[in-house]
Amino acid sequence: IKEYKLTTELYKKMIMSFCDAYKVINPVIMGCSMGGRVVLHLALEQSNFFKAVISLEGSDKLDAYYDLDWLHRPDVHGGEVQAAFVSSQIAPQSPEKFKHETLWHYMQGGPGIFKGDLYFYWHDGDFDDRSSLINTKDCPVYLLSGEYDCSCTPERTEATAKRIKGSKATIIPGIGHFPMSENPDLFKRYINPILEEISDL
């Protein structure tokens, strides 16, 4: 069986195929983590299609910081290892029930899927050499990052925002890498004003 690796082109194609199938008009797209990265690609390449993009815990470049081979081995439970790796990215004060639910999602992935997704997230999706070409007048860009995110750190988000002229970056206190799932009530306080701003565009 061929090893699964999510590429930038495949990821963008899946999203645009969905939009085409449902014939969406003037959509706003929001993604988190690897989704936060791919929406920045779409802001660059599909600026006339999307009304705005919202990148949660997203940046235009990341560096790998743990060994991916642990995620797909016959002697290791991949789901439990995946949850262990990402558990450090959740803010300590996030509600326990939401922490567990977030980690439970990571325990459900099929063999090799998370490892293959990280190929895009850590390697193929980097485009810090081109992100400055995003035209935020055509497609406004909003970046939000949690202060407890040790993967896409606030510093990485802010560095990306500096490269994307006209983008708006917000660092959310008391939240980690999974704002919408680890602490939805806190997240709503920050995302709702942005949605209202976009609705007025």
Task: Report each predicted region and the residues it spans.
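Short alpha-helix in the alpha/beta-hydrolase fold that links the catalytic acid
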Residues: T153-K162
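Active-site loop/oxyanion-hole signature of alpha/beta-hydrolase fold enzymes
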Residues: I1-M30, R189
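Flexible "cap/lid" loop of the alpha/beta hydrolase fold
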Residues: L40-E80
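Conserved alpha/beta-hydrolase catalytic His-Asp/Glu region
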Residues: A64-Y65, V76-N135
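Short beta-strand/loop motif that positions the catalytic acidic residue
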Residues: K137, L143-S145
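Acidic catalytic loop of the alpha/beta-hydrolase fold
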Residues: E147-C152
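Gly/Ala-rich beta-loop-alpha elbow adjacent to hydrolase catalytic centers
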Residues: G31, G35, V39
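Catalytic active-site module of serine/aspartate enzymes centered on a nucleophile-bearing elbow/loop
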Residues: S167-L201
